[in-house]
Swiss-Prot record:
Highest taxon listed in the record's lineage: Eukaryota
Maturation-removed propeptide residues: 21-26
Keywords: Disulfide bond, Secreted, Signal, Toxin
Listed name of the protein: U8-lycotoxin-Ls1e
PTM text: Contains 4 disulfide bonds.
InterPro entries documented for this protein: Spider_toxin_CSTX_knottin
Organism phylogeny: Eukaryota, Metazoa, Ecdysozoa, Arthropoda, Chelicerata
Gene Ontology molecular function: any one: toxin activity
Organism: Lycosa singoriensis
Family affiliation: Belongs to the neurotoxin 19 (CSTX) family. 08 (U8-Lctx) subfamily.
Signal sequence annotation: 1-20
Cell compartments where the protein resides: Secreted
Tissue specificity: Expressed by the venom gland.
GO cellular component: extracellular region
Length: 77
């Protein structure tokens, strides 16, 4: 009986370890991918930059994208 309980606990620990490892290996978001709902998922050389959207002076939303660290984007007319 003790052997069955011990075996069950070992199997549970192994399955938990495999699931935790799979969770840590999620693919990162590439450059220009939307990161509005996942700001920490950009690849290591990128940062999640967010921009407000406005219409007639009123804020209507927010967009976030994975962009290169240290790069400044300027609007061109």
């Amino acid at each position: 009986m003790k052997l069955i309980i011990f075996t069950g606990l070992v199997l549970f620990a192994i399955v938990s370890l495999i699931e935790a490892q799979a969770e840590n290996e999620k693919p990162c978001l590439a450059q220009y991918q939307v990161c509005t709902h996942a700001p920490g998922n950009c690849c290591s050389n990128l940062v999640c930059d967010c921009y407000g959207r406005y219409k007639s002076g009123a804020r209507i939303g927010r967009n976030c994208f994975c962009l290169q660290k240290g790069v400044i984007y300027k609007r061109e007319d």
